[in-house]
Amino acid sequence: PHVTNQLIRQALHPYPDDLVIVTKVGARRGSDGSWPHARSRQEIIEAVHDNLRNLGLDVLDVVNLRLGGFSGPVDEPFEEPLTALVELKQQGLIRQIGLSTVSPEQVAHAQAITDIVCVQNFYNVAQRTDDEFVDLLTAQGVAYVPYFPLGGFSPLQSSKLNEVAASLGATAMQVAIAWLLHRSPNMLLIPGTSSVQHLRENLEAARLEPVSYTHLRA
């Protein structure tokens, strides 16, 4: 469970001044590969200190609190883990706090407790439940971090995306990323990147002109 942070440290430490590292707490890796909740006050504190140690940092730029589940946001109390993060922020161990897999109502409730700088939810050109939520966060100046840029596509939607990609000489992933980039100015993307070539392909998505795939919004 600590491998990713250790690899980041090996590759990038000492970190450049303009690098922002975002971590996530609220779940732990089970021995069976599952991700059960880990949201008690003590679990949150331990997770933050684990991140600090494995990354070789004295303070974490942003810590996202993971709520909900793989099926989406869940209406459940989260004051205990959020309050723990606020305490750690007051201690100078965290600079900013974000939320993951949450509803607009949960974000509003959290904002009554502390500042929220980002929201990480499932969103892409085919999964548009958060359309109004994205616009609300844009108006508030809160970053929106969509995950699974190709998740949840029907066969018809996948076929249409592939057609658009072929017409542009691009991959389906590049078109999906480009659509997100141009959807709203508060988008921060986290596409999976498994190799240097994969990274280059993802970066090429920024070259696509939005006029080429505007009809995908329909």
Indicate residue ranges for each PLM-predicted region.
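Active-site mouth loops of central-metabolism enzymes
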Residues: 31-42
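Glycine-rich, proline-tolerant flexible connector loops at the mouths of alpha/beta enzymes
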Residues: 1-7, 70-72
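A short, structured active-site edge motif that brings together acidic residues
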Residues: 18-30
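Acidic (Asp/Glu)-rich catalytic clusters
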Residues: 10-16, 53-56, 111, 135-139
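Active-site groove signature of glycoside hydrolases
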Residues: 55-71
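Beta/alpha (TIM)-barrel catalytic core signal, keyed to glycine-rich beta->alpha loops juxtaposed to Asp/Glu
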Residues: 68-212
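Conserved small/polar residues in nucleotide/adenosyl-binding loops
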Residues: 214-218
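Short, acidic/polar
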Residues: 40-53
